[in-house]
Amino acid sequence: MHQHRSGKLTRRTRHMSFVASIVVAVMAASVPLVAAQAAPIELPTRAVLPFALAQKIADAAIQKAKAIPADGVIAIVDDAGEVILQIRMDNAFMRASSRLAPEKARSAVMFHRSTATLEAAVAGPRPALVTAPGFVMLKGGEPIVINGHLVGGIGVSVDTPDHDEDIAQAGLAVIK
């Protein structure tokens, strides 16, 4: 410490002591904050549809489409409705199928039910459902549920609504 000849502390020494006491106080106060930050944060986990399984589902749907025969578009989406894969067969029936298939899959995910169920609701007790913006209420969309968890959806658009539904069901048979 700096002392004057008279034995008294200089102003610089008093200032340094004051600063040191503030630093010690801040450090002592921050110890609980550091301890609180060190605790792990629990984040929710969710089931996801792996790409390899999406491919297997699509392959089964393609095989069914070829067996009918009914070429078209098959789309697989994740649980947020984002496309994982989309396949347009060589002789797809309609150009609109490239838009319909992923929208059917997305609608099945967002409503957590078959689009055949949605189509029946629109045709029957819930005609106002058709006003839901951005959804396709046509057969051919199915949610993909594994171990009770919604992980995605499949959407099919080929030549007829019944074929759409049959092909989507064939894809789902992979996980049942």
Language-model segments: which ranges?
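Bacterial N-terminal signal peptides
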Residues: S17-P32
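Flexible, solvent-exposed loop/hinge segments and secondary-structure transition points
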Residues: A36-K176
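Intrinsic structural disorder/low-complexity segments
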Residues: R5-G7, F18, G152
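Secondary-structure junction/capping motif
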Residues: H15-S17, S114
